[in-house]
Amino acid sequence: MKLKNIKFFFQLFIPDKNKILILDKEGSEDLVQYVLSDVKNIKIYDLKRITIYFNITFILKFLKNILNIHINNCSFIKKIYIIYIKTEIEFIDPQIIITYNDDNSIYHSLSYVIKNRTFIAIQNGLREKFIRDRIEFKINHDYLYCFGLNDREKNISTNWLVKNHRPVGSLRAGIAITKFNSLKKKYDICLISEYEPRKRNDPDNHHWNDHWLLVTEIMSELFKKRNYQIIIALNGHGGTRELDYFQSILPLNVAYTNPNIELDSYRAIMESNVTVGFCSTLLLESLALNSKALQINTAQDNSYFQFDSKFIHEYSQINNLEKRIDELMSIPYDSYRKSIKNFIPKYMNIDENNLPQSQINQNIKEILLS
């Protein structure tokens, strides 16, 4: 995080105590509304905001921490930033520090320097090889609520430290199941947008964008050939440029989600027979949303989406892809679900009778009482 993105505020008194600290605003509304709705004494800590305390007690504690805490492989400015947050958290004195940003470097740095607190993270995206290769800091979870058993295997193989894996599925998918449980199918295909305002051959993202653009061009060709009922799940990146891009390459009769409406992409998936994409988290989440998932792989390896071949189409020519999609659409959903039942615990382990939000809520209450 760059200092220029941080806003500074000033305060005379030390922060109030709270039992639960939500670290960072990302996903905090979901946590408060759906996971912690019956829990009191919650504070949301905004990592883009620093409160400067003109308080002698705070200042002395901060200086003591600077002298006593050693953080390796970290710039001086980041070290001071982490120690300052640690000092503030010591005054807040939470039992639980929870985040919906499971690969946040500040969260993991704090987990090593703050003792006698329970650190809980909720997985909010796929953690495939091309993502893991870019993470240079140490991962350390007390509890990780992950998508499935497959995540546990990947974490172990990558030497990510997780004391307690809780494979409960996707929290947002669980919320969507509650919110949209009576939807009927309206679309043949939902294409998941992974749009980023980047140019081709951008090495900064391991050429992921190049593959996604190619997948989009392939699907555009297929959509012009066939009269499918289509909806595009927009991600909202790039503002109006994302919609402009799709409208420039797709037929006029295509529907689009509204990124400004909560969980609208999840609604679109639940209304679609087949969900198609490259390496979006939504593609895996569709397994819990009564849709049939298909990755179109143009990368010739599994570094972007390492799952069973049942969910992957190795692209060679458009006729083969067309045949694969038609086969998927023709299968009754109950038959499809039965054919993938052994993969559900591994990839998206949602129990519709005990959704992720309920499991996390119950576990948090148990920790608070312990």
Q: Which residues does each predicted region cover?
A:
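Short, charged, surface-exposed secondary-structure boundary motifs
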Residues: I52-I59, K129-I135, K154-S157, I175-F180, ...
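C-terminal alpha-helical cap of glycosyltransferases
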Residues: M348-S370
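Catalytic binding pocket for nucleotide-activated donors in carbohydrate/polymer assembly enzymes
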Residues: H141, T281-D351
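Well-ordered, non-membrane alpha-helical segments in soluble/globular domains
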Residues: E29-Q33, K78-I83, H206-E221, Q357-N361
